[in-house]
Design a protein with these regions (language model features):
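Transmembrane alpha-helix termini and helix-breaking/packing motifs in multi-pass membrane transporters
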Residues: 32-41, 92-96, 151-171, 239-243, ...
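Loop-to-transmembrane helix entry/capping segments in MFS-fold secondary transporters
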Residues: 45-46, 131-141, 326-336
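Hydrophobic core of transmembrane alpha-helices in multi-pass small-molecule transporters
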Residues: 21, 89, 100-116, 297-311
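C-terminal transmembrane bundle of multi-pass solute transporters/carriers
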Residues: 55-71, 76-83, 92, 240-397
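Juxtamembrane intracellular "pre-TM" segments in multi-pass secondary transporters
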Residues: 1-14, 188-221, 397
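Helix-loop junctions on the cytosolic side of multi-pass membrane transporters
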Residues: 127, 169, 173-197, 380-392
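Cytoplasmic helix-loop-helix junction between adjacent transmembrane helices
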Residues: 106-147
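A single, central transmembrane helix in multi-pass transporters
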Residues: 21, 25, 29-33, 163-170, ...
């Protein structure tokens, strides 16, 4: 499958796509509104960053206890219920006078719910599409999320100029509720991919199985660490330039769209395995220029160019699926998403802490340097793994 026409002719893909777009819009508008609300209340870059990316901090806890449900729950019911739960949480965040501590409690709950949703979504996409359509389909999902971010952050910034953050949160809740309805009406009822009831013990067993393979471990770490550190840079856009954060987020989303389009549509399958390291280096290196405190036009250009590097995730997910049994696809993708989002939350907290002690520009530079170091270290570990495997292969022959 190489064309978008074939992709959208696949039964159920279109409503799945539309619901994902609505959820992306809700996430971007609501996240920007919440970060703005917290920053106005606290004047803290750390709390602003964590409020926007804080749900990610709960992802790994959810992956530890809930992720077996990704393959053991009916996908349609699970996804529509998750979107409805997000609508409810966002309504709570919009309540006037909600204490900051309660805000972070709701944000933590959203992260737990999202840890299950990522696995169900990835597993269902793998089920709806044929094997040769997974990367193209995943790229479309990533691209629409990027486009929705461009529109969502631009719209969110414009809305915040004329409406209160709480009103924007209400709009976000309405989008989540709409997505829930689309999922319920647009998807077919399917049985779970794996037998048995979701449980903590089943989650732990499958996590241990997935983590037992060294190639999978390196693939997971490559998806989690460099990405998470750079999202720490993104979490500082509000404190770097409070009046133009929407422009920077939109520039990042545009770069992400270009990266996903290029990797998913134009790069030959034989070339994709070589892309992750160069793209991850591209993701981090431009942020070093924030040491110069660039103004808005240059900052937006830097962010856009760097975000092309997020296209590495498509090649990494394709490798993960090649290393994973089909019946564990949802769990494997859920663990990937939970770990990635957890590290994004850690990156946001770390970047916010450094910014609190120094400045947002200095913190971005430090996070970029850390991401480059991690990418080069993992690349060296991958080369050692290949060299170690070659004598074993030769001996068997």
């Amino acid at each position: 499958m190489r064309s978008y026409r074939e992709l959208f002719r696949t039964p159920e893909f279109t409503p799945f796509f539309l619901a994902s777009a609505a959820q992306g819009g809700a996430l971007t508008i609501g996240g920007l509104a919440l970060a703005t609300l917290v920053y106005r209340a606290t004047d803290s870059p750390l709390l602003s960053a964590v409020s926007m990316f804080g749900p990610q901090l709960a992802q790994m806890l959810g992956a530890t206890f809930l992720l077996s449900g990704a393959d053991r729950l009916p996908p349609r019911a699970a996804l529509s219920s998750i979107s409805l739960a997000f609508a409810g949480c966002t309504l709570v965040l919009a309540l006037p006078g909600l204490p900051v501590g309660a805000v972070f409690g709701v944000v933590f709950l959203q992260g737990l719910i999202a840890s299950l949703g990522g696995g169900v979504t990835g597993g269902l996409l793998n089920e709806i599409l044929p094997k040769d359509g997974f990367v193209l389909g995943r790229s479309v999902f990533n691209m629409v999320f990027g486009l929705v971010q461009v529109v969502g952050f631009a719209t969110g910034g414009a809305l915040l100029a004329v409406l209160s953050p709480r009103t924007c949160l209400l709009l976000s809740a309405a989008l989540y509720a709409t997505a829930s309805v689309v999922l319920r009406l647009g998807l077919s009822a399917r049985p779970p991919r794996s037998s048995g009831r979701p449980s903590v013990s089943a989650t732990w067993r499958t996590n241990a199985l997935l983590w037992s393979s060294r190639p999978r471990r390196l693939t997971y770490l490559g998806m989690w660490l460099p990405n998470g550190l750079i999202v720490g840079c993104e979490s500082l856009y509000v404190s770097y330039d409070p009046g133009a954060a929407g422009v920077l987020f939109s520039a990042a989303a545009l770069g992400m769209f270009v990266g996903d389009l290029s990797v998913g549509r134009f790069v030959p399958p034989a070339l994709r395995p070589r892309l992750p390291v160069p793209l991850l280096l591209l993701l981090a290196a431009p942020y070093l220029l924030f040491a110069l405190r660039p103004g808005l036009p240059w900052a937006a250009l830097i962010v856009c160019v760097a975000s092309v590097g997020f296209g590495a995730t498509l090649a990494q997910q394709e490798r993960l699926m090649a290393l994973t049994p089909d019946e564990l696809a949802g769990h494997a993708l859920g663990l990937r998403g939970a770990g990635m989002l957890t590290m994004q939350g850690v990156g946001a907290a770390l970047a916010g802490t450094v910014a609190q002690l120094t400045s947002p520009g200095s913190a971005m530079t430090a996070m970029a340097a850390a991401s480059l170091t991690v990418t080069l270290t993992l690349a060296a570990a991958g080369r050692r793994q290949v060299r170690d495997a070659e004598p074993v292969t030769a001996a068997r022959e």
